[in-house]
Amino acid sequence: MHKRAIYPGTFDPVTNGHADLIERAAKLFQHVVIGIAANPSKQPRFTLDERVQLLKLVTAHLDNVEVVGFSGLLVDFAKDQQASVLVRGLRAVSDFEYEFQLANMNRRLDPDLESVFLTPSEENSFISSTLVKEVALHGGDVSQFVHPEVSKALLSKG
């Protein structure tokens, strides 16, 4: 059994879809590291520290989940964390092509690192951070898509 898995992402912001996948991963693996990518090329709305804090709030009830920010190659971060599995989410068939390319690239960079794909529950399958930010930016209510603390943080960002 794989003991340690990494669920990487930008999480800008963390959504109920992400939380759903984290819950599922926490049941499958002894320890799950949520790797929050610094990824400055995406121009995140929240700083890395803010994203780490929000994810810690969202996952506080899960004893086997740890939240860590990182920069650089994911395969290097996985090695540093002694993880042998990457958890990735698939919302729709359209996600598969990109995720398939990523999985193959990661496998080339580290043949011992496996990618496992999880799907969120149906009610969370359409949620994306991009859509949540767009709704919030235009003054819409995002409370059904994110944790209450994330909703507050989005409101404070304006």
UniProtKB/Swiss-Prot annotation:
Binding site for substrate: T10, K42, L74, R88
Broad class of enzyme this protein falls into: transferase
Entries under Pfam families matching the protein: CTP_transf_like
Location of this chain's protein in the cell: Cytoplasm
Catalytic activity field: (R)-4'-phosphopantetheine + ATP + H(+) = 3'-dephospho-CoA + diphosphate
A GO cellular component entry from the record: cytoplasm
Pathway(s) this gene product operates in, as recorded in its UniProt entry: Cofactor biosynthesis; coenzyme A biosynthesis; CoA from (R)-pantothenate: step 4/5
Annotated keywords: ATP-binding, Coenzyme A biosynthesis, Cytoplasm, Magnesium, Nucleotide-binding, Nucleotidyltransferase, Transferase
Entry GO MF terms: ATP binding; pantetheine-phosphate adenylyltransferase activity
CDD domains on file: PPAT (cd02163)
Family: Belongs to the bacterial CoaD family.
Alphabetical list of HAMAP family matching this protein: PPAT_bact
Subunit structure: Homohexamer.
Role played: Reversibly transfers an adenylyl group from ATP to 4'-phosphopantetheine, yielding dephospho-CoA (dPCoA) and pyrophosphate.
Name of this protein: Phosphopantetheine adenylyltransferase
Organism whose genome encodes this protein: Shewanella woodyi (strain ATCC 51908 / MS32)
